[in-house]
A protein has these predicted regions:
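N-terminal secretory signal peptides and thylakoid transit peptides that target proteins
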Residues: 2-20
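C-terminal segment of N-terminal export signals and the immediately downstream linker at the start
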Residues: 27-42
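Surface-exposed beta-strand/loop patches in extracellular or lumenal glycoproteins
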Residues: 51-71, 256-264
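Solvent-exposed beta-strand/loop surfaces of large extracellular or lumenal domains
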Residues: 78-101, 430-442
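An acidic-aromatic substrate-binding cleft motif
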Residues: 127-154, 473-581, 585, 617-620
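Beta-strand/loop-rich accessory regions of lumenal/periplasmic or secreted enzymes
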Residues: 139-492, 545-553, 567-570, 628-631
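Terminal, non-catalytic domain-edge segments
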Residues: 474-483, 705-717, 721-732, 736-755, ...
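Catalytic cores of eukaryotic secretory-pathway lumenal/extracellular enzymes that build
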Residues: 534-570, 602-715, 730-758, 762, ...
Length: 905
């Protein structure tokens, strides 16, 4: 079978574009690249358009045109003045010819990083104090400058200790959890994380990564499997902590009442030199001492007060005797708590010790989730990202008046109601398929008893842990909190990514005509609308944050949060892809962070990571697991891969790799089991009916990614087997589905019936096919795909003239315009280009292109709050319009202009 690489004239033009890009670089960077061969210079920018005051360390991905970068080529990073920066790089993906397709690059942590950077060919510079990692039989030691972390390889301490200089500033760091056996008033059990496996993934010199895997154990039970990654960067006194866990309990009896990370902090300073700091907002801090010296009846002196407020040691001899002699009469405050039980409110309270009353200290709206306890001789800070967004969260400091304090970042606050993972509804007499289909008909929910199961859902949280040599100043603590809450991110410029010809078909922003400006405006407005709706509608909470709603209720002026299949979107019709393609072309921070939060949600919460549904995701619903339709189209690796390549994120890499064998889940989960009128097929063992788009296309994204990441031709061959066998069917892609042999990876049967679904191409199949056909030459598959693209949106008359078969139902004409545009571009058919442009601008079964900004603000008693509405919007329509706009601008820009002029006339 012939396989190979398709190199088009467009690819050649992109190589020229890359060559021209070097003129935009500093002379030093151009000279460095001149000494190389084909390595194009790569400008890198901060997504916020400005250098941050503090970077906690950076990892970003760089794409390379095919053939431009040989494996093993040394790469360096230079700042805006051409000075080489310490850096580390490694491969992420390869082209079929073995050249590198994506590399990841790490830069140290530090203040005032360069405003812009360039990746060039050349030996990387080592940092002044490289990350040093040493592994023994029972522990892993990481040293960064004066800070040393000792990490356990077994036992209950994720980190055994941390030293700043010669002083141990932190003892054990452990994962903790508690569970109640009833939603209210239940018996509580406590659990601690136990390490079962430790793996060193990187050893420096700029970045080291340790992966820890285990379970939470206690009360004779081991459950809540976890993966924790610890990241150390050169120049840093902190570790990045990425904490992932899977809920593997029984929703009817396991109500998690606390989930967190707890550090033990040695305390030996005088009580008045022990400091507590808790972030209260964007730049606010709650700053107190265990024994306060301010506000007393007697004045200790300005120097003492100033030193305590600044977090510095108080000179006891210089203190006024009227205070110095009565210090033991001033109460010490050992316990502090910030509880963020909603997205819009937190409260801070403190008490002298256990058994005494809590005293309210202050309250506010949105804490950034950083807590610190320590003294002028050292301490520990910890911060949780998405702290208020993923409420209920909490920061606890306990025993600050004793020899050992504890500092806890709660991902689920023990002050909140326990986590309730039960289904939101009961059976309601819907035991049989007939009743279930009636329910689907009225609420759009696919319900089946026992399939609305939360067991197997996961959540990943990101934290930062600092080992501080002294109490940081207020401004630096605020910068630490901000850098954790909204991490600065480097990204290659959109122009350079586009020129590398990666990630399928997409366009750069183009406002060169009134029509294109209207399209660009709507692309910006849509992202802004959804980003703002997250806050207006309160799409927050531990399990909800990152997702958006499916459909709007124009009568109640709310999204349909309580109506069956109209509530949480769960990746329906690819909002993840729309947002990531918007990021690629715009580089906008708002789009990036909206897409990032969605990726963290949809790849974890909406997907099963263990149990009978492992590898499948859940269709849109009131709860993220409530719909009984479990599908590969939701777990889809296509929704994760752009984030992975832009950031090198190891957790997302794990999630995509876990999907590689997920086709096997369909041997015991029949996803089409109750479709009305569906033909029940008796198939041989190991053969499952697959749709080409929503099933095979989703799995193909995982196999494509694994082939790129590993170079293992098994996955290329599996792709080729599927492609070739679809191409051999009588009607190819128009057959819609066919029996699939899991062992050979081939579709079997004749494919002699046409079965068109409007869903088949809108869960990443268009985007994955664009990449497959760029990489693998299977002519009969290409013909089958182009045939589908040509005929999906064809008129009934054209269809009848060609097939003499029933036309059938169609939907999503606007979104499918990009399929018409693709076949037009590939065949050079001007008539199809015009048809595609008319389909897109016609807006049928889609969002439509607005003339101006359609958003309307409302307030008053008919609305819950100040409300902004986009008439006719749904996430399905927004996602497909966004993708069609981005891709049609790349495929048929001239035809769009002609069709717009035709429409005006």
């Amino acid at each position: 079978m012939k396989t190979g690489i398709i190199v088009s004239r467009r690819d050649s033009l992109r190589f020229g574009l890359l060559t021209g890009a070097s003129a935009l670089l500093p002379a030093a960077a151009r000279a460095a690249n001149a000494r190389g061969s084909n390595v194009p210079p790569t400008p890198v920018r901060w997504i916020d358009d400005a250098a941050p005051p503090l970077s906690l360390g950076q990892t970003f991905g760089v794409p390379w045109p095919q053939g431009a970068l040989r494996a093993g080529t040394a790469l360096s990073v230079k700042d805006a003045e051409g000075k080489a920066l310490p850096s580390q790089h490694w491969p992420l993906a390869s082209w079929p010819d073995g050249s590198l397709k994506w590399t990841a690059h790490a830069l140290p942590a530090g203040d005032t990083p360069s405003a812009s950077m360039t990746v060039v060919q050349g030996k990387p510079v080592a940092p002044p104090a490289p990350v040093l990692l040493r592994e023994t039989a029972d522990r892993i030691m990481i040293t960064v400058g004066l800070v040393q972390w000792t990490i356990g390889k077994s036992g209950n301490s994720i980190i055994q200790s941390a030293k700043a200089g010669e002083r141990t500033v932190m003892g054990s760091l452990a994962l903790i959890a508690s569970v109640d056996n009833a939603p209210q008033g239940g018996e509580r059990s406590h659990f601690t994380g136990r390490i079962d496996k430790a793996t060193v993934e990187q050893k420096g010199p700029v970045r080291a990564v340790v992966k820890l895997e285990g379970m939470h154990e206690g009360q004779g039970r081991a459950w809540l499997p976890f993966v924790v990654r610890l990241y150390a960067y050169a120049g840093a006194d902190h570790l990045r902590v990425v904490h992932s866990f899977i809920f593997d309990g029984d929703p009817a009896r396991d109500f998690i009442s606390g989930l967190g990370v707890r550090a033990q902090v040695p305390m030996d300073a005088a009580p008045h030199d022990r400091h507590v700091r808790i972030s209260t907002g964007a730049d606010g801090l709650f700053s107190e001492a265990v024994r306060p010296l301010t506000g007393l009846r007697r004045d200790p002196g300005a120097a003492a007060r100033k030193a305590q407020i600044a977090g510095q040691a108080v000179a006891i001899d210089a203190m006024a005797p009227t205070v110095r002699n009565l210090l033991d009469r001033i109460p010490t405050w050992g316990d502090f708590t910030l509880s963020q039980l909603s997205a819009d409110g937190f409260a801070i309270a403190k008490r002298t010790k256990a058994g005494q009353a809590w005293i309210d200290a202050t309250s506010g709206t949105r804490s950034q989730g950083l807590g610190y306890v320590g003294s002028p001789t050292g301490g520990v800070a910890i911060a949780a990202r998405y702290f208020w967004q993923r409420h209920p969260a909490q920061i606890d400091i306990r025993g600050a008046d004793t020899d050992q304090a504890s500092l806890t970042a709660w991902l689920w606050s023990p002050n909140a109601q326990p986590m309730d993972m039960r289904p939101y509804r009961d059976v309601m007499g819907m035991e049989a398929y007939a009743a279930q289909n009636e329910g689907l008909d009225i609420t759009y929910e696919d319900y089946e008893p026992g399939w609305d199961d939360a067991t197997g859902a996961a959540r990943t949280s990101e934290l930062t842990l600092w080992a501080c040599a002294a109490t940081p100043g207020a401004a630096h603590l605020a910068a630490m909190a901000q850098a954790n809450a909204t991490p600065p991110q480097l990204m290659v410029t959109p122009e350079r990514i586009h020129a590398a010809d990666v990630l399928g078909i997409w366009s750069l922003p183009d406002r060169s005509s009134p029509l294109k400006a209207r399209i660009e405006d709507q692309l910006v407005n849509l992202v802004d609308f959804y980003a703002e709706e997250v806050d207006r509608r309160g799409w927050y909470g531990f399990w909800n944050h990152g997702d958006v709603m499916h459909t709007y209720d124009e009568d109640r002026h709310v999204w349909r949060y309580d109506i069956g299949g109209y509530a949480w979107a769960n990746s329906e019709l690819s909002p993840d892809l729309w947002l990531w393609y918007d990021v690629l072309r715009s580089g906008r921070a708002r789009a990036f962070r909206l897409a990032e939060a969605m990726t963290r949600h949809t790849g974890e919460v909406d997907v099963y990571h263990l149990g009978r549904f492992a590898g499948l995701g859940t269709r849109h619903g009131v709860q993220h697991w409530s719909d009984s339709s479990k599908q590969p189209r939701v777990s889809n690796a296509a929704y994760r891969r752009i984030f992975y390549y832009l950031t090198g994120d190891e957790r997302v890499g794990d999630l995509m790799r876990a999907l590689v064998p997920s086709d096997q889940a369909l041997t015991h989960v029949e996803i089409g089991r109750k479709v009305p009128g569906a033909e029940r097929k008796t198939l041989p063992e190991g053969v499952v009916d697959f749709s080409f788009g929503t099933v095979w296309g989703s799995l193909a994204a995982a196999w494509l990614t694994e082939w790129e990441r590993t170079g293992d031709v098994r996955w290329r061959d599996r792709l080729v087997a599927g492609m070739d066998s679809i191409g051999r069917l009588k009607y190819g892609w128009l057959a819609g589905s066919a029996p699939y042999d899991l062992k050979s990876g081939r579709f079997i049967g004749s494919g002699d019936k046409i079965s068109i679904s409007h869903l088949n191409a809108v869960f990443g199949a268009f985007e994955v096919n664009a990449e497959l056909l760029q990489l693998i030459d299977v002519p009969r598959y290409r013909a089958a795909w182009l045939d589908y693209c040509r005929w999906f949106n064809a008129s009934p008359q054209e269809w009848d003239a060609h097939f003499s078969l029933p036309f059938g139902k169609r939907n999503l004409k606007e979104g499918h315009s990009r399929l018409t545009a693709y076949v037009a571009r590939e065949t050079g058919d001007a008539a199809l280009s015009t048809r595609a442009a008319r389909e897109f601008l016609g807006g049928e079964a889609g969002l439509g292109l607005s003339d101006g900004d359609p958003r309307v603000a409302h307030s008053g008693p008919d609305f819950v709050r100040l409300t902004v509405e986009w008439p006719g919007v749904s996430t399905n329509a927004a996602s497909q319009w966004g993708l069609a706009a981005i891709q049609n601008l790349a495929l048929i820009p001239d035809a769009l202009e002609w069709a717009a002029a035709e429409k005006r006339n």
